[in-house]
Amino acid sequence: MRCLLLWMVVLAARAAPARSLVYRGEAVGLRADGPVAFAVHPTDATLALRGRLIFLEHQLPAGRRYNGTVELLRYHAAGDCFVMLQTTAFASCPRVANNAFRSCLHADTRPARSERRASAAVENHVLFSIARPRPIDSGLYFLRVGIYGGTAGSERRRDVFPLAAFVHSFGEPGDPEAAARTPAPSRQSRPAASGLTSSASLYDRALARSPQAPPPRPAPPRAARAGPRRPERVDETTEVEAATRAGSAFALTTPPAGPTASPAASPSRAFSAAAPAAAAQPAGDTPARFRRQLASILVPLCVLVLLLLALCAATVNCALRRRLLPCSRRVYKPRTCAACGSGTCAGRPPCRGAAPSAPATVVALGSRPKAPPLATISEE
């Protein structure tokens, strides 16, 4: 028994340590190099957490192609709200092994207007990255992923994966300049409702809602409605517009004004109430994408039409030359040789005409001289 325990301890010590962390969700899984990304200010130029989205068993979408969205959110503890940093809509993604969002035909990325240093590129195996990281960037981030099939009526599933970033500065306790330049959380996003704050966790809140604009002000009198209404501050424009332009099927609209949800209300009811409004929005139907799809259809069609016209023109030309224009046909007849009278040599040398027949030689038997007798030969 002791030998067995000692052998297990040695085997565990020699085993290679785990180098990645796998999160299993409902629609997709996430494989990250670690739960937290570290950086040192101002030494490191980029903070990045690498990983990829994968399909585990029984998670492959139905059909040959699927669509989806990837959204990068940040949680602000001071305002108890979420901020949309980037929205990416993918379309016509093939099912390549177990990799999600690989070799997609279309990818439309819309970063936030206020913060463009943070981004996510899951197609390049980068879960999120921050350019020129500062201590103020330390915090909790969420990667919200939604996948649905390309066919109508397919089920839409979403998952939220927590990520964290930690930026430390050895020379300074913090970054007061960056904190002074950061706008108030009330301008960036709206705090969650009291029901969701008390009864739901950060995971449920990030899954069920998106950053919203501050509550609208009361309507002006009728005299003021005649002129065009413009926002007083540009900062009030939220990242929800960017998510809507990107064609995200999961960007939730602002719920209508009504009684505040009770603390006993569950986040699933809030999400189910906002789901029909999100499903009514077209997924990834922007004018730029429509123009690209139209060009991808018209260009091959024009090439095929030109090839068909060229083939028809060649056929008509051949028919005219062979059928309707007999004068253009030339029949080759070899010349007759003047010497031999045949057309095989066409009068070219070494043809020298027909060979003359040799005269027959007639030999008479009686004209031959007789041989002398033997006696005469002996005397001589």
Curated annotation (Swiss-Prot):
- In this entry, the parts of the chain located on the Virion surface side of the membrane are 21-293
InterPro entries for the chain: Herpes_gI
Q: Which GO terms describe its cellular component?
A: host cell; host cell Golgi membrane; host cell junction; membrane; viral envelope; virion membrane
Carbohydrate-modified residues are N67
Give residue spans on the Intravirion membrane side: 315-380
Cellular compartment(s):
Virion membrane; Host cell membrane; Host cell junction; Host Golgi apparatus membrane
Q: How does it sit in the membrane?
A: Single-pass membrane protein; Single-pass type I membrane protein
Q: Which residues lie within the region annotated Disordered?
A: 172-269
> Signal peptide position in this chain?
1-20
* Compositional bias of kind Low complexity: 249-269
Q: Where is the composition biased (Pro residues)?
A: 212-221
Q: Does the keyword Glycoprotein apply?
A: yes
Q: Where is the composition biased (Polar residues)?
A: 185-201
| Keyword vocabulary terms for this entry | Glycoprotein, Host cell junction, Host cell membrane, Host Golgi apparatus, Host membrane, Membrane, Phosphoprotein, Signal, Transmembrane, Transmembrane helix, Viral envelope protein, Virion
Record's Pfam families?
A: Herpes_gI
> Which spans are transmembrane here?
294-314
State what this protein does. In epithelial cells, the heterodimer gE/gI is required for the cell-to-cell spread of the virus, by sorting nascent virions to cell junctions. Once the virus reaches the cell junctions, virus particles can spread to adjacent cells extremely rapidly through interactions with cellular receptors that accumulate at these junctions. Implicated in basolateral spread in polarized cells. In neuronal cells, gE/gI is essential for the anterograde spread of the infection throughout the host nervous system.
Instruction: Kindly state the subunit structure of this protein.
Output: Interacts with gE.
Give the similarity note: Belongs to the alphaherpesvirinae glycoprotein I family.
Its name, as the record gives it, is Envelope glycoprotein I
- The species this protein was found in: Bovine herpesvirus 1.2 (strain ST) (BoHV-1)
**Gene this protein is translated from:** gI
